[in-house]
């Protein structure tokens, strides 16, 4: 059956799931996060520490809403763990952290400063996780789905390894949003291939997030359709927006341009 037209019609299916986090999702938080984005390339440690702290808070709030207690002692699998900043932040929160990262360069990018904080790390693809079914309490993927050719295979793998009653949190950058082109800037609105060519012409090398090989056009509708097809989706909201702007997730076409980053929350049964 072709599900491309079957889009999840609402932003929140089970409102209580986001009750705690909604209190944190203020305009002040949104502006603070936005101000950090300019440091991603020149000062990545600053940017990723801020993003990691916010992610830990978001996951903790979602777990608290669904389970009535913080996720202390719970096992979290981070699909696309990168250079270890999330590991340090989750360790500080008392979460048992396992990171999965296919690129060894990313695994070592943060240097030795984070090693004492690190949990366990596995080099593997998120589209074929080397874990048994029902192995972890929480499965997180932050800004990874747009970098793999089969994002919903990644999503299905996340569901597979998460225990019934656990939590899957999948967040990704929407292609047509202002940050969809990553370091290519707004030129992605000219088309991905053209933007990639312009980047090479300007910088003399291909972008790290290279269209067609490490960056793919993933829409909000794609994610909402996939979430609906699983039967276990409980929430969807814009990651960086204040609570009063979450309604944008419900508006076709508009959401592709203004939601920017979509969070899908699922509870396996």
From Swiss-Prot:
The entry's keywords: Methyltransferase, Transferase
Enzyme nomenclature, EC number: 2.1.1.-
Gene Ontology biological-process entries: methylation
Enzyme category, top tier: transferase
SUPFAM superfamilies assigned: S-adenosyl-L-methionine-dependent methyltransferases (SSF53335)
Taxonomy, superkingdom: Bacteria
Gene Ontology molecular functions: S-adenosylmethionine-dependent methyltransferase activity
PANTHER family, sorted: METHYLTRANSFERASE
Family label: Belongs to the methyltransferase superfamily.
Protein's recorded name: Uncharacterized methyltransferase ML2584
């Amino acid at each position: 059956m072709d599900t491309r037209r079957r889009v999840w019609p609402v932003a929140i299916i089970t409102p209580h799931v986001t009750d705690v986090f909604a209190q944190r999702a203020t305009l002040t938080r949104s502006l603070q996060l936005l101000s950090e984005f300019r440091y991603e390339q020149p000062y990545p440690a600053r940017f990723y520490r801020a993003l990691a702290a916010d992610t830990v808070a978001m996951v903790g709030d979602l777990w608290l809403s669904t389970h009535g207690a913080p996720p202390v002692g719970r096992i979290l699998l981070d699909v696309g763990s990168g250079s270890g900043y999330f590991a340090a932040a989750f360790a500080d929160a008392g979460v048992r952290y396992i990171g999965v990262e296919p690129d060894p360069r990313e695994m070592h990018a943060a240097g030795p400063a984070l090693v004492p904080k690190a949990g366990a790390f596995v080099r593997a693809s998120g589209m074929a996780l080397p874990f048994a079914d029902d192995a972890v309490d929480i499965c997180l993927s932050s800004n990874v789905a747009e970098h793999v050719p089969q994002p919903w295979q990644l999503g299905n793998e996340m569901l597979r390894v998460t225990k019934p009653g656990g939590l899957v949190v999948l967040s990704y950058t929407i292609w047509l949003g202002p940050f969809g082109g990553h370091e290519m800037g707004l030129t992605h609105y000219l088309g991905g291939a053209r933007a990639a060519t312009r980047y090479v012409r300007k910088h003399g090398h291909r972008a790290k997030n290279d269209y067609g090989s490490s960056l793919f056009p993933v829409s909000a509708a794609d994610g909402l359709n996939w979430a609906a097809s699983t039967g276990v989706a409980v929430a969807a909201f814009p990651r960086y927006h204040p609570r009063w702007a979450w309604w944008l997730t419900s508006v076709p076409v508009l959401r592709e341009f203004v939601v920017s980053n979509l969070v899908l929350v699922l509870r396996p049964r």
